[in-house]
UniProtKB/Swiss-Prot annotation:
It holds the Pfam family FRQ. Residues 1-139, 208-290, 331-445, 524-642, 865-907, 968-989 are annotated as: Disordered. It comes from Neurospora crassa (strain ATCC 24698 / 74-OR23-1A / CBS 708.71 / DSM 1257 / FGSC 987). GO terms for cellular component: cytoplasm; nucleus. This is Frequency clock protein. Circadian clock component involved in the generation of biological rhythms, in particular in rhythm stability, period length, and temperature compensation. Oscillates in abundance with a daily peak early in the morning. Behaves as a negative element in circadian transcriptional loop. May bind to wc-2 protein. The complex frq-wc-2 may turn off the expression of frq. The keyword Phosphoprotein applies. It is found in: Nucleus.
Amino acid sequence: MADSGDKSQGMRPPPFDSRGHPLPRRASPDKSITLENHRLARDTSSRVTSSSALGVTESQPQLKSSPTRRNSSGESEPTNWFNQSNRNPAAAFHDESHIMEVDPPFYQKETDSSNEESRYPPGRNPVHPPGGVQLPGFRPVAAHSSAADDYRSVIDDLTVENKRLKEELKRYKQFGSDVMRKEKLFEIKVHGLPRRKKRELEATLRDFAASLGDSSESTSQRRKTGRHGTAVHSSGVSLSKHDSSSSSRSRPVDSAYNSMSTGRSSHAPHSSGPSLGRPSLTRAKSVGTQKVENYLRDTPDGLLPHHIVMTDKEKKKLVVRRLEQLFTGKISGRNMQRNQSMPSMDAPLAPEGTNMAPPRPPPEGLREACIQLQDGDNPRKNRSSKDNGSASNSGGDQTELGGTGTGSGDGSGSGGRTGNNTSPPGAIAPDQRPTRPRDLDPDRVQIPSENMDYIRHLGLVSPEFLQGSRTSYQDVAPDAEGWVYLNLLCNLAQLHMVNVTPSFIRQAVSEKSTKFQLSADGRKIRWRGGTDGTKFSSDSSEDKSQQSPMTEDTEDGSDKNGRRKKRKTQQASSEIGRFGPSRSPSDTFHYKPMFVHRNSSSIETSLEESMSQGSEDAVDESNMGNSKWDFSGSGTTQQRRKRRYDGAIVYYTGAPFCTDLSGDPGDMSPTAQMTAGREVEGSGSGDEVEHVLQRTLSGSSLPIRPLSDDRARVAEVLDFDPGNPPELVADDGSSPNDEDFVFPWCEDPAKVRIQPIAKEVMEPSGLGGVLPDDHFVMLVTTRRVVRPILQRQLSRSTTSEDTAEFIAERLAAIRTSSPLPPRSHRLTVAPLQVEYVSGQFRRLNPAPLPPPAIFYPPFSTDSSWDDGDDLASDDEEVEEVEEDSYSEGQISRRANPHFSDNNTYMRKDDLAFDTETDVRMDSDDNRLSDSGHNMRAMMPRAEAVDGDDSPLAAVTGKEVDMLHTGSSVATAGGAESGYSSSMEDVSSS
């Protein structure tokens, strides 16, 4: 009991219930842990404030072995904490007592009793020591102060500033293509420069950057020529975009497959001996120093992935082009020359004015492996070009002995030339050469005869059985039938990359091409189109007359070989004069936009257009003037909204283009080509300011509003004379005259004379409720007064005043909470007012009834129906009989609806007409039914008119358009005409 008494000392005994048990309740406020922490914080804060004011520093107990998180001096105010940390920042780290005092005072420590007790051993809690002893030197962790709120605004400002700095850093880190980063030469930023001057500066710097690449490349070319003057490289007489570099670094022309292979290198000097199959030391060293990403420069664009969304119509055209390429060797379309891979050339051309021919390349093996020799005596006989137009020898050296033969193509298959064999008989080419990526390019120029040999080799007909029947390699269908399995063509690379099915190919061929023939079962296809492919409407006219180099070389004879080489050499020299001795390798990685927003009215897009463009065309289109994507003259993206900041303009070494990260504003549409050394093409004088087309919010480009602006301003802008308006011209070219108008103009209304009305006979109609007496004419005289322009302007101003007055009255009614007084609305008078002067009503004579209809019943005893002589005597009587006898009952019912159907229709069994009469009845019935659709409603009865001068009569006064039905039909009415029933005719007869 003593222990219990000690524990309950200082506490109020809990109340007990009726059974003597203590009631469960919370502890007293004096023993609350949360309130105790608040008291400690308040007391400590007050002590620190008083001691700091008196300059007295409170002694701090050194508890080095205490495991507390914070062992501070007791300052809980954020101001004191910041001051102490800023004045002596190293003390908190060197002093062992301040080793954990690095957190700001905003750290809120949990004050839960369970968490406090779990962090410290029993009896070791420094905040709540055992026995209620309080250590005076410890700062409470849950300090609340108003000074903490002062720094929250500072933190918010720092957060905003940090965000702004991140955006600025991201803006300064903007680069162009990652691949072009190594070729970057310099970048500039333009601030406040006019657009025209900015474009001039861009053109000047662009030419300067391109000239740097040309000079470095020409230096490297001269060094290569002097060092390897007798070395032999891959052949070709036309330029290639791969034979250039933006710096003095050199790289192989071929791909990684050819460069890293252990076979004989085509770039090593020709030699014989044990080192025939090894690359040279210089070649191996250059390969080892290069990076793998450089090999991608030689990858053709046709092998690169192109994720392009095409419609079915565009895909069908692409399939037809690919199929025709197999049989013609050419790609039809606007970009025929652009997409076809050109041969690679690594050796420099001979200087102008010299007669030195380009060096002859060494003999090179075939791309495919030779499995079995067919002729043991001459192993080189069967090694002629069979590599599907992809060998590297374009000089025609691999020909049969003692004659001429077809040489293989170059790296892109554009060879196929013929020439005499001048190589020594003992020189034997190696067995096989490595496959290059350009050999697999689907866009390369192909040889149709070799394509057919390849297809026959897959299982159709062996080529050796057709050697006797084949006389020329130009025959695109050498076999007798010419049928090729369609499933076989689908597996070729040209169509396999498009990802189409045989059924889709059949549909495309049947719809888009007339030069193929499908078999009856649809499994085979053959070519019937000659040597040219299908020309689509989307193809430009300039490409229709172009031919590929392979076709031109194949069709020419061997006697034209010299002229052909000379012509191509001159063409290559002219290109060197324009773009320097070589093109930069960055042309391969020319900037292509990721998102191109084209107009719906633009011409159709094909897959070849969306692929990588040729170096020359791509640079010209996207860097100078308007391109087909509507880009600006500095390689920028499409017209867009004006940015909040200006980006940098990046220039690259040897590249004739730049990357403008700022772009031009949306209203900028340059239409001129800008260069540094020439004047601005397509523009007038230099002082002219470029006209920017302004549009209204509704999208109109007119500088005026014809319906709301003043007539004088409209006439001035549109160059229109209000006093002398132009004549209205009809569609047939005739202009209307004043005589064609119905209402003549009259200055004096008192002298108006009513013209006499022509007596027109009212034709009878079959409308119900119309009597013969309904025959009248309304004569109305009108007068139109044109108000002057001044009065019209006054009425417009009064309208605005009325609006202001109405708004003022409405506001006054709202303030006084009184009902709105009734306001008299003024009627706006139209500029042209119509006044009715007089109106007359004249009743005409009743319309006469039509003559009686003639009808012969089928049971009549009269024999005149079958008498041919009587019918042929009078043609008019025959026509009348046929018109009136085809359906008398139907006419009677339409003209006289008051009669019963029993009196108007005859029985079907009683009608016995011949075949000729039935046919004529049908034709007449169709004619009358068509006329019934064109009937118009006539004027109401005369009794509906109130009087001659009534406004209703004046308004409804119009001339009645009579309907000419062309048939004799009685006018419906109340009086019987005596001819409404056919039974009366029977009884009277």
